[in-house]
Amino acid sequence: MKNVTHSFVFLAHWPSAGSFGLNTNILATNLINLTVVVGVLIFFGKGVLKDLLDNRKQRILSTIRNSEELRRGTIEKLEKARIRLQKVELEADEYRMNGYSDIEREKANLINATSISLEQLEKSKNETLYFEKQRAMNQVRQRVFQQAVQGALGTLNSCLNTELHFRTIRANIGILGSMEWKR
């Protein structure tokens, strides 16, 4: 580019040889000078302008490619984040449901344990009442038996005299003696 600029400067200071020369005063230029200047500008400027436009185009395309890659990467990250969010929500729902089911299970277990304890207490109470009733009945039986024995002894003592007593003893000894010989 520096060479192109020096060429224009060189042409501008070129001494005119007669009829052809480069007039740098734009207002005093003629059509030929303008055509030459425009032609030189197009010839040399076309490459420079094309290089500038190509560089700009490459930068724009590169920026677009980078933006597309970033967009794809962002979309992938967003999809991964959505999938992860869904997994976390499912796990949270599962933990919540498991927590509720654990609470319900513990509640049912507690109710069952309490019910079993109440049944055992009721059974123990009934057994205790039964044993107390049996003990009271046994005590009554013992008293009745003792009173009956005492009454019978009293009756026997009052009815038996000494001779009747001796006769009963001899009869019992005779019965026992005959039982012994039979064996």
Swiss-Prot record:
Keyword tags? ATP synthesis, CF(0), Chloroplast, Hydrogen ion transport, Ion transport, Membrane, Plastid, Thylakoid, Transmembrane, Transmembrane helix, Transport
Keyword Transport attached? yes
Q: Name one GO molecular function term.
A: proton-transporting ATP synthase activity, rotational mechanism
Please indicate if the UniProt record lists Transport as a keyword: yes
Per the UniProt record, which residue ranges are transmembrane? 27-49
Q: Write down the membrane topology.
A: Single-pass membrane protein
A single Pfam family it belongs to is: ATP-synt_B
Which GO CC annotations does the UniProt entry carry? chloroplast thylakoid membrane; proton-transporting ATP synthase complex
Q: Where in the cell is it found?
A: Plastid, Chloroplast thylakoid membrane
Task: Tell me which family the UniProt entry assigns to this protein.
Answer: Belongs to the ATPase B chain family.
Which purpose does this protein serve, as stated in its record? Answer: F(1)F(0) ATP synthase produces ATP from ADP in the presence of a proton or sodium gradient. F-type ATPases consist of two structural domains, F(1) containing the extramembraneous catalytic core and F(0) containing the membrane proton channel, linked together by a central stalk and a peripheral stalk. During catalysis, ATP synthesis in the catalytic domain of F(1) is coupled via a rotary mechanism of the central stalk subunits to proton translocation.
**What does the record note on quaternary structure?**
F-type ATPases have 2 components, F(1) - the catalytic core - and F(0) - the membrane proton channel. F(1) has five subunits: alpha(3), beta(3), gamma(1), delta(1), epsilon(1). F(0) has four main subunits: a(1), b(1), b'(1) and c(10-14). The alpha and beta chains form an alternating ring which encloses part of the gamma chain. F(1) is attached to F(0) by a central stalk formed by the gamma and epsilon chains, while a peripheral stalk is formed by the delta, b and b' chains.
Q: What is this protein called?
A: ATP synthase subunit b, chloroplastic
> Source species, please?
Lolium perenne
